[in-house]
Design a protein with these regions (language model features):
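Conserved nucleotide-sugar donor-binding catalytic segment
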Residues: 39, 97-171
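Short aromatic/hydrophobic "clamp" motif used to bind/position activated sugar donors
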Residues: 46
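Short alpha-helix within the catalytic core of nucleotide-sugar-dependent glycosyltransferases
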Residues: 6-7, 35, 43, 56-68
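Non-catalytic, C-terminal membrane-associated alpha-helical segments of glycosyltransferases
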Residues: 148, 154-155, 163-209
Length: 209
């Protein structure tokens, strides 16, 4: 990271011995960096937070409560879309559950909203070969039959930043199609059907900006 993330993490690590700051010897890219963290982590659950996003203070507590009741492998939550200044744009309320077929049509999981069992991530990693490495992993987990359940409360502020990977709609669409065809090996008709639904959901989700 070229911003102050490391310094901020270092400060909090000095206050709490449970926090460990790991520095890459060189820029390894987002997928390999996350995978390194997965391999080192010792806890039962793993949560991710992208540097642009904000967790609400009770996010982990509420997701763990759902995990205890539901016995799920993946817990995800609803989120608020905010702009670069933190101003509210819209809310995205996730469905109670999702599946492989549902995730083909609309991805309700995102890095900053998921809580995953560590055992899963010992066997499944982000691929550095794909632009949408997170979406490719979510599909893989669903295909393997892991159970995902929602905490439907808004527990994350998801920041929409001009020029970010997620804000480039045309490039996102291109790589979504490649995942359908090259990674999941879907037929042309099934890919087209999933892509059309994905596009319609995207227009609805981002209609306010």
């Amino acid at each position: 990271s070229s911003d102050c993330t490391a310094e901020i993490a270092e400060y909090f690590a000095s206050l709490d011995t449970r926090i460990r700051l790991l520095r890459n010897p060189q820029n390894m890219g987002v997928a390999k960096t996350r995978n390194r963290g997965f391999d080192i982590a010792k806890g039962e659950w793993i949560a991710l937070l992208d540097s642009d996003d904000v967790w609400h203070s009770d996010k982990l507590e509420k997701q763990l409560a759902v995990a205890g009741r539901a016995g799920a492998d993946i817990i995800y939550c609803s989120y608020a879309l905010v702009n670069e200044s933190g101003a509210h744009l819209s809310d995205y309320i996730v469905p109670e559950t999702t599946s492989y077929d549902a995730m083909l049509r609309e991805s309700v999981l995102s890095c900053s909203t998921v809580l995953l069992r560590q055992l899963i991530l010992r066997e499944h990693h982000f691929s550095a070969e794909h632009y949408h490495e997170d979406y490719a992993l979510w599909l893989e987990l669903m295909r393997f039959g892991y159970r995902a359940v929602a905490c439907r409360e808004i527990l994350v502020d998801y920041r929409v930043v001009n020029g970010s990977r997620s804000s480039n709609k045309f490039k996102s669409a291109k790589y979504r199609w490649e995942i359908y065809r090259d990674v999941e090996r879907l037929s042309l008709p099934r890919s087209a059907q999933a892509f059309l639904t994905y596009a319609l959901h995207g227009m609805r989700k981002h209609r306010r900006f």
